[in-house]
UniProtKB/Swiss-Prot annotation:
It is a multi-pass membrane protein. CDD domains: ATP-synt_Fo_a_6. This is ATP synthase subunit a, chloroplastic. It is found in: Plastid, Chloroplast thylakoid membrane. Keywords: ATP synthesis, CF(0), Chloroplast, Hydrogen ion transport, Ion transport, Membrane, Plastid, Thylakoid, Transmembrane, Transmembrane helix, Transport. Coiled coil: none annotated.
Length: 247
């Protein structure tokens, strides 16, 4: 009976967390459109955290920085280093974009582990990290694609499209396909890792509620940070590639 009870609890946990993805959604009806309310609510919370942190960081800057100012300056330097490494000397205008991507994904990922989303009851579905929803990760990947094309066109004009027939026109279909697979790989990598992390925690909490999930949660925090870094690094690399014009 204990085994059956554990199995039922595990299946219930898996059903609850997967409910965010398989149709148990909370929608807002605005005119003739259905708006995905779950993602908007959690995204607004993440944005509020970022804006609040930014306002604290710039409220009273000191010539001799204190601990909090040092922390935010370190984050800025880190983002600048990532951008410069991947984009090159023309990285400056892209630091805000890469930084926004990195910080939004990082805070979104960590919010899934640290914020008690599931305590908030909704008529349908449940709240979870914004990056736990494929809609969010696809939107972020499409933004990266727009930035990728904008960087290339602003640098080279219509001559940017000549890269599709280099080094030979035979590679035209492959080069076009590559630009479609980039946002797909970005979105599914981020979505899959975050969803898998939460599923593992749910299974372990159902089986061993007290001890085992704790180190797994710490591992999840670490991998969540790594996923944010990977996404931002690849976004910067794609932008740098489009400006340089080589693969």
């Amino acid at each position: 009976m204990d085994v059956l009870s554990c199995s039922n609890n595990t299946l219930k946990g898996l059903y609850d967390i997967s409910g965010v993805e398989v149709g148990q959604h909370f929608y807002w009806q605005i005119g003739g459109f259905q708006v995905h309310g779950q993602v908007l609510i959690t995204s607004w919370v993440v944005i509020a955290i970022l804006l609040g942190s930014a306002s604290i960081a710039v409220r009273n800057p000191q010539t001799i920085p204190n601990d909090s100012q040092n922390f935010f300056e370190y984050i800025l330097e880190f983002i600048r280093d990532v951008s410069k490494t991947q984009i090159g000397e023309e990285y400056g205008p892209w630091v805000p974009f890469i930084g926004t991507m990195f910080l939004f994904i990082f805070v979104s990922n960590w919010s899934g582990a640290l914020l008690p989303w599931k305590l908030v009851e909704l008529p349908h579905g449940e709240l979870a990290a914004p990056t736990n929803d494929i809609n969010t990760t696809v939107a972020l990947a499409l933004l990266t694609s727009v930035a990728y094309f904008y960087a290339g066109l602003s640098k080279k004009g219509l001559g940017y499209f000549s890269k599709y027939i280099q080094p030979t026109p035979i590679l035209l279909p492959i080069n076009i396909l590559e630009d479609f697979t980039k946002p797909l790989s970005l979105s599914f990598r981020l979505f899959g890792n975050i969803l898998a992390d939460e599923l593992v925690v749910v299974v372990l909490v159902s089986l061993v509620p007290s001890v085992v999930p704790i180190p797994v949660m710490f591992l999840g925090l670490f991998t969540s940070g790594i996923q944010a870094l990977i996404f931002a690094t690849l976004a910067a690399a794609y932008i740098g590639e489009s400006m340089e014009g080589h693969h």
